[in-house]
Curated annotation (Swiss-Prot):
Keywords tagged on the record: ATP-binding, Ligase, Nucleotide-binding, One-carbon metabolism
InterPro entries assigned to the protein according to its UniProt record, in alphabetical order: Formate_THF_ligase (IPR000559), Formate_THF_ligase_CS (IPR020628), P-loop_NTPase (IPR027417)
EC class of the enzyme, as a word: ligase
Catalysed transformations (reactions): (6S)-5,6,7,8-tetrahydrofolate + formate + ATP = (6R)-10-formyltetrahydrofolate + ADP + phosphate
Stated name of the protein: Formate--tetrahydrofolate ligase
Single biological process term from Gene Ontology: tetrahydrofolate interconversion
Similarity comment: Belongs to the formate--tetrahydrofolate ligase family.
Pfam family name, one: FTHFS
Gene Ontology molecular function, alphabetical: ATP binding; formate-tetrahydrofolate ligase activity
Keyword ATP-binding: yes
Top-level taxon of the source organism: Bacteria
Binding-site list for ATP: T53, P54, A55, G56, E57, G58, K59, T60
Length: 542
């Protein structure tokens, strides 16, 4: 690894905007972005994927490798990524810093506590929860209805025992007993707010708008009513600054914020993306899960808020994912199966068609695994060419930037100045926005709203939230809301079970299917593979 000062020098960053965290990590003062406003923006490359298998398809690895490969062919590039969540790192998924020869460094530190941003978000979130219950205990001047408190508590850990709890037991000295729950920190609205805020003023305004409860008159109670947004911002004072690290080949990487891609928008901070676009020719960023979730939200929501638009999209696919969506069993996924591959290719086709609806040039990155056969690779390449889409076999995991040269060249040939196309208008009612997304992206035949969802729609209209963008929270395991429907389901009924407003983040969340905001640990969590020796060397994290 290079000292972080050398990485900063590549970007022209002076010491007065750099806050080092040891030798290899630094934060960049978020106010530095304003000094760059007269610079021309570089190209923005959005990396997304087909519907993933449980193991993931290498989207982060591809993003890192593509950025390194762009630098290799003489194009100045920065990769921007979300911060890993500690819970999944210790649980089933493992770390989120790429893999093989395409990683961000120092991987262990990034995957674990990093610069403390997750802790800051959790602290701000839980401060609000504590102040809310304290207000109720000490007279409840705002007349908060304890049966209509929406704000949960948070922890950056997978712990299913905390999904449903009772607080305030043990007598009046401990407050009022009521049901509560914990969510993982990445699902906190504070995380979404931090990722969307462009400066401290914006951050405090967004925090103040967060809805925490209803009072006994059925009126909304916000953070600003409790007067705690200033203290929450104090706890987030350093977390608003993007984190600078490097890849395995010394390419600069900005890693900042980590909102979930189902309950929120699933990409790194707007500050990091805009800063990278000012400092490089090509910014490579990724959106969580498949293109039906992350990419749609990036374009319909994040791009609108940030004032930018991708110049191209990279659709990451793997032979194993396509075989899985063609009916192959995960136990036999590494065996050649052209029939399953042919059937599963329909999943790639749907995601490609969806991306093209946004007027985006698309490059398919076929992330090669050692078990892929030549026949399987050739089939995917041939079918992509039939669809008129550029395709490049990517081997950045095994070969680093050398394995992504073909992909980098395809991306530079594909990029163009794109006229933004959004699927819905902001003045469309929420119900119509959901129907557009369900039919255009998820390929549903019709949309059904539960009675709970219908009541939520009335609340949304009554309180003036109908013109907010929509974030659909559904399973990432299928294009539909049903995780058992692999491949390219269509014509089904898309069921909306409930809706709620994230007023600070500025969107309405539509829930479809079972959405769990506090993951649990598997039978054998990744934590069992971790250890540290007497010299402080960590094993088993990434």
């Amino acid at each position: 690894m290079k000292p972080i000062k050398e990485i900063a020098d590549q970007l022209g960053l002076k010491d007065d905007v750099l806050y080092p965290y040891g030798h290899y990590i630094a934060k960049i003062d978020h106010r530095f972005l304003k000094s760059l406003e007269n610079r021309e923006d570089g190209k923005l490359i959005l990396v997304t994927a087909v519907t993933p298998t449980p193991a993931g398809e290498g989207k982060t690895t591809t993003s890192i490798g593509l950025s390194m490969s762009l630098n290799r062919i003489g194009k100045k590039s920065i990769v921007t990524l979300r911060e890993p969540s500690l819970g999944p790192t210790l649980g089933l998924k493992g770390g989120a810093t790429g893999g093989g020869r395409s990683r961000v460094l120092p991987s262990d530190e990034i995957n674990l506590h990093f610069t403390g941003d997750m802790h800051a978000v959790a602290s701000a979130h839980n401060l609000l929860a504590a102040v809310l219950d304290s207000h109720i205990k000490h007279g409840n001047e705002l007349k908060i209805d304890i049966t209509r408190v929406f704000w949960k508590r948070t922890m950056d850990m997978n712990d299913r025992a905390l999904r449903s709890i009772v607080i305030g037991l043990g007598g009046s000295a401990n407050g009022f007993p009521r049901e509560d729950s914990f969510i993982i920190t990445a699902a906190s609205e504070v995380m979404a707010v931090l990722a969307l805020s462009e400066n401290m003023k914006d951050l405090k305004e967004r925090l103040g708008k967060i809805i925490v409860a209803l009072n006994t008159d059925r009126k909304i109670v916000r953070v600003s009513d409790l007067g705690i947004q200033g203290a929450m911002a104090v706890l987030l004072k350093d977390a608003i600054n993007p984190n600078l690290v490097q890849t395995t080949e010394g390419t600069p990487a900005l890693i900042h914020c980590g909102p979930f891609a189902n309950i929120a928008h699933g990409t790194n901070s707007i500050i990091a993306t805009k800063m990278a676009m000012k400092l490089s020719e090509y910014t490579v960023t990724e959106a969580g899960f498949g293109a039906d979730l992350g990419a749609e939200k990036f374009i319909d929501f994040v791009s609108r808020v940030g004032g930018f638009y991708p110049n191209a999209a990279v659709l990451v696919a793997t032979v194993r994912a396509l075989k899985y969506h063609g009916g192959a069993d995960l136990k036999n996924i590494h065996e050649e199966n052209l029939e399953a591959l042919k059937e599963g290719f329909k999943n790639l086709r749907v995601h490609l068609e969806n991306l093209r609806k946004f007027n985006l040039p698309v490059v398919v990155a076929l992330n090669r695994f050692i078990t892929d056969t030549e026949k399987e690779i050739a089939y995917v390449v041939k079918e992509c060419e039939k669809l008129g889409v550029r395709v490049a076999v990517s081997e950045v995991f095994e070969k680093g930037s050398e394995g992504g040269v073909e992909l980098a060249k395809a991306v530079t040939e594909a990029v163009k100045d794109v006229k933004p196309v959004y699927l819905y208008e902001m003045n469309d009612p929420v119900e119509k926005k959901i129907e557009i997304l369900a039919k255009e992206i998820y390929r549903a035949g019709r949309v059904e709203f539960s009675d709970t969802a219908k009541n939520a729609l009335k609340f949304i209209k009554k309180h003036g939230f109908d013109e907010l963008p929509v974030i659909v929270a559904k399973t990432p395991k299928s294009i539909s809301h049903d995780p058992s429907l692999r491949g390219a389901p269509e014509g089904y009924t898309f069921v909306v079970s409930d809706l709620f407003v994230s007023a600070g983040a500025g969107f309405v969340v539509a829930l479809s299917g079972d959405i769990n905001l506090m993951p649990g640990l598997p039978e054998r969590p990744n934590a069992l593979n971790m250890d540290v020796d007497d010299s402080g060397n960590i094993v088993g994290v990434s």
